[in-house]
Regions:
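The catalytic Nudix box helix
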Residues: 48-49, 66-98
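Short glycine-enriched loop/turn motifs at secondary-structure junctions
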Residues: 2, 64-66, 126-130
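A glycine-rich, hydrophobic loop/mini-helix early in the fold
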Residues: 35-67
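A structural signal for short, well-ordered beta-strand segments
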Residues: 38, 67, 98, 115-116
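Nudix hydrolase/Nudix homology domain
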Residues: 24, 102, 107-165
């Protein structure tokens, strides 16, 4: 199925379900939706950073500190997180820790997100349609890179809040 045709859950400002529409309609209308964000760490406490493909419908080619994606209609945040880990990284049967929910709004994106973390060493099987490359970075390296490269703004916001808690 073309990702633009996937049916996603639309919510209101209080994260209450209001409709189900295609991803295309959601993006075109900048409708509030749900997404999961998974911070993937290795045993050295480095975080997995992925480079998004140029075909992504939002932030193409950007770096992202979170694996994850849009919650589909009928899915819970946790079901979505497990699906996204399997699709994007080939990671199955990993323990997820839920951290916090948040609302993020930008010019082209309005989302209620839930943040998870997990421990996974790799090697990963990257989904070529979504992930161009990926690598683990320590926090100092990540801060240096974030100052010089394009990162997804919601991903950086998630990491900043995660590190503060």
């Amino acid at each position: 199925m073309n990702p633009a045709d996937e049916i996603v859950q639309i919510v209101d400002e209080q994260n209450q379900e209001v409709a189900q529409v295609s991803r295309r309609v959601m993006r075109e209308g900048c409708l509030i939706h749900r997404a999961c964000y998974i911070l993937v760490f290795n045993r050295s406490r480095e975080i997995f950073v992925q480079k998004r493909t140029m075909s992504k419908d939002i932030y193409p080619g950007y770096l992202d500190v979170a694996t994850g994606g849009v919650v589909l209609a009928g899915e819970s945040y946790e079901q979505s997180a497990k699906r996204e880990l399997a699709e994007e990284l080939g990671v199955h049967k990993v323990g997820l820790t839920s951290h916090f929910d948040f609302y993020h709004e930008a010019d082209n994106n309005r989302v209620w997100g839930r943040v998870f973390s997990c421990l996974a060493e790799g090697p990963f099987v990257l989904q070529p349609e979504e992930v161009e490359d990926g690598f683990f970075l320590g926090m100092d390296e990540l801060q240096s890179l974030a100052a010089a490269a394009q990162f997804t703004p919601d991903g950086l916001m998630v990491l900043k809040r995660f590190m503060a808690e």
